[in-house]
Amino acid sequence: MSDDDFLLRLEAALARHTGKPAKVHDLQRLTGGANRTTMSFDVGGADPGEPRRQCILQLGTQTFDSVVGMVPQITPAEQARVMIAAARVGAPAPRVIAILEPADALGEGYITARVAGETLGARIVRDERFAAARRVMARQCGEILAAIHRIDPGEAPFLMRQDAAAHVAAHRSIVDNYNFKLPALELALRWAAENVPRNQRLTVLHGDFRTGNMIVGEEGIRCVLDWELAQAGDPMQDLGWLCIRTWRFGGAGPVGGFGSREDLFAAYERASGHPVDPAHVRFWEAFGNVKWAVDCLLLGTRGIEEVGIERSAIGRRIEEPLWDFFDLIESRE
């Protein structure tokens, strides 16, 4: 498809979904890969004097691996539906303008309003302009996660449901099927299987709530991005994933590189009405490192087949999350 044809189809899709004539300006590709593309653009109406709206177009296809498919992943249309549900309960999700349909002839995807701000983790946890934001972000994370966990699972019946034991078993199967042989990883998976927490609630989860997947301004968190791993499961999983060292980007705070666990837990308890057991979250923080270690191996394996080196470089980092896992369970942090 030529660039001109793509532009015409995008304008037609906007007009179809909004009921208004649309003129697209400044279409730019922000990221692109084999299965996912993000573009930004401005849209105006028929009147040249009409204010433009800043938008984001997400295009993607769901790839299926019979082994990796045992862990949650949803389609672009399903992501958009979860974001709509999240916004209804007060979570700062992108405002969905349109969910693409076959008649739009653009592929799978959705269009949202664009939110200004910073997403790069290293800047968020280090730049002086975000110093005030860092003081409130752990509290904001607790409040946002409490809101996400209030989503009615009935609004997203397509979400995979997995408790902690199922997550551990799925990653055990991935390691076995890909024939990854690392003694440290074997020991970590055994620890996880033997320490599955009891009394797990079932809620909708973001699935990848962390620094780097949120838009931040000087006042704090403006928007939560990257909902493709949304699922139904133990809500403490979201809290633990936010705390793993990888997502601190060199920042000092154990929560995302910017805050304390105490602030996160207290805010979550106030907003949700549910108590937080630090040991329960600690399991998910520890197992989060195991999951990331498995992801590093998977990305490294796929990187061998690609031209770029980014995935291969991630594959070489497997020792980091495994070190963090053992450091955490031995309580040296």
Please provide the spans of the model-predicted regions.
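Activation of the activation-loop gatekeeper triad in protein kinase-fold domains
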Residues: 225-230
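Juxta-kinase regulatory segment immediately upstream of eukaryotic protein kinase catalytic domains
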Residues: 1-20
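Catalytic-loop of the protein kinase fold
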Residues: 204-206, 211
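Conserved protein kinase catalytic-loop anchor
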Residues: 202-204, 222
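All-alpha amphipathic helical-bundle segments outside canonical DNA-binding/catalytic cores
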Residues: 159, 275-287
